[in-house]
Amino acid sequence: MEKYEKLEKVGEGTYGKVYKAQDRATGQLVALKKTRLEMDEEGIPPTALREISILRLLSQSLYVVRLLSVEQATKNGKPVLYLVFEFLDTDLKKFVDAYRKGPNPRPLPTNVIKSFLYQLCKGVAHCHGHGVLHRDLKPQNLLVDKEKGILKIADLGLGRAFTVPMKSYTHEIVTLWYRAPEVLLGSTHYSTGVDIWSVGCIFAEMVRRQALFPGDSELQQLLHIFRLLGTPTEEQWPGVTDLRDWHEFPQWKPQILERQVPSLEPEGVDLLSKMLQYNPANRISAKAAMEHPYFDSLDKSQF
């Protein structure tokens, strides 16, 4: 690891510490992710090798953070694995916060919301096309290149070898705000719809500059969702009452979605409602979302 000079710790990712570092030879800035992977005498576990090869494959998309290399080092006599990613200076949470807070609060420009949402759908479609779910999409792991106006998905693909924990090991609670109702209700058989739900929540948050469903526990999270969208029924979502954590919830009627996103044009509200369908099978796919009329005014040739 002499190849890289660590400049500063920039965060604790879901999977370990993240450092901003510089390649001593080229001066290129990189993000070093130190993984907490238990390596044995045999070296890197096969599950991790598989995940890394998936990451390599996925990072060929412009809208997924690029994995540059994998480095092995030794710390206290134990092997440590570092993943080396391209470095981006900010994330979508910080980007939205800059519009919400500070001396000059203002909405995000419509063209920026459209562009970022389109890029997010494109990145998610790329992952789903390779059979990979992200399962933890949130503004904090969407990295933004402000100069170029590019949004990239990070913290991806380490789903099985490095299971996404409920608590990150810094004991911060992993946020539930973007989690799909089937996951909150204990479904173990989930599919691409879990990511689309998260994309819908992120879309609404760019428009509102605050979270759509800010729950602080799994139950509170469900109640936030049910109060806005109505308590789901078997007609709407066959099998919902058989899910592990289903209870007799209070019966709420659906509210008008437009009121939560008053500045959003009708096509945008339509797309949002297609992402926030209760039945995962009825949620729009990332690929179909890219063809939605909401994006008709966007110059797609740039992507």
Curated annotation (Swiss-Prot):
- What SMART domains would the database entry show? S_TKc
Induction info: Down-regulated by sucrose starvation in suspension cell culture.
User: What tissues is it present in?
Assistant: Expressed in actively dividing cells: root and shoot apical meristems, and young leaves.
For the modification Phosphothreonine, the affected residues are T14, T170
Does the keyword Nucleotide-binding feature in the UniProt annotation?
yes
Catalytic residue list: D136 (proton acceptor)
Entry protein name:
Cyclin-dependent kinase B1-1
The gene it comes from is: CDKB1-1
